[in-house]
Amino acid sequence: MAEQEQWQLQGSAAELYERYLVPAITVLWAADLVDRAAPQSGERVLDVACGTGVVARLAAERMGSGQVVGLDINTGMLAVARSLPTGAGPRIDWHEGSALEMPFPDATFDLVLCQLGLQFFPDRSSALREMFRVLVPDGRLALSVFSAIERTPAAKALVDALDRHLGPGASATKRSEHSLADADELYQLVAGAGFRQVTIHTTTQNIRFPSSKEYVRLQLAATPQAGLVSGMDAGHRDAIIAAIIGDVSSSLAIYSTGGELMFPQEAHVVLARK
């Protein structure tokens, strides 16, 4: 996987991600995933590609007691995760490491969670086999990935604008968020790693931003798309961003009421057992 296609954030970008994008998008999917996975008191839970830790924190709050571990390859994301307070429940242990070679013994966890991360792994099958390995017999897997980009109108509007104003291929990173959209492919990957009782639930969340302008601004500041414009001189950058905002705002006019943007976002949620 090319460097630009990896979900890599550092320093202030990770802080912006936690401050703005987690409340707007990620926490909705995190709550849905944790509800479906239903972690129980006393269980050992692993959150793979934990980012700034929203899934791990929600799981810990639900459990009350047990063990929760967050794993991510990104130092900046983990720094933010460690800096945030945890609520009720067990202390969360944060580990830096790859999902392709997890630093845990076999049969360590009762439940493995992975929210919106599998599509970014350079070897998805290896990552799933690692999840299988670290689960106890009959252990549970719960993961989510975005479906087709057309099922998230704001993302589709953004990639079209990026390619129009920054050249073909500028949207590759954003499009990669939706690169595991085929439910049949997803099923075969999970089953092929050894999991059984595999079910896929396709569901939708309504995502809100103060405006289309704010959606674009955050996408170009708190995600890997920031690299597309960060090296430009200020005048050129501002003109490009204004043009992208104009196109996205026009495309999303039907999703805007009183200036506020609200659009549907669809994802596949997978539940399975070892």
Model-found features: residue ranges?
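Short SAM/SAH-binding signature in class I
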Residues: L46, T108-L116, A267
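Conserved Class I S-adenosyl-L-methionine
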Residues: E3-W7, A14, T52-V54, H178-K274
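Class I SAM-dependent methyltransferase Rossmann-like catalytic core
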Residues: G11-A24
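Conserved alpha-helix/loop element of class I SAM-dependent methyltransferases that forms part
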Residues: P23-E43, L58
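A short SAM/SAH-binding and catalytic strip from SAM-dependent methyltransferases
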Residues: D110-R124, S147
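Conserved catalytic/acceptor-binding region of the Class I
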Residues: S125, F132-S211, A226
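Class I SAM-dependent methyltransferase SAM/SAH-binding core
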Residues: R44-M102, L111, S125-S126
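A generic alpha-to-beta junction signature in SAM-dependent methyltransferases
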Residues: A37-P39, R62-M63, L128, L135
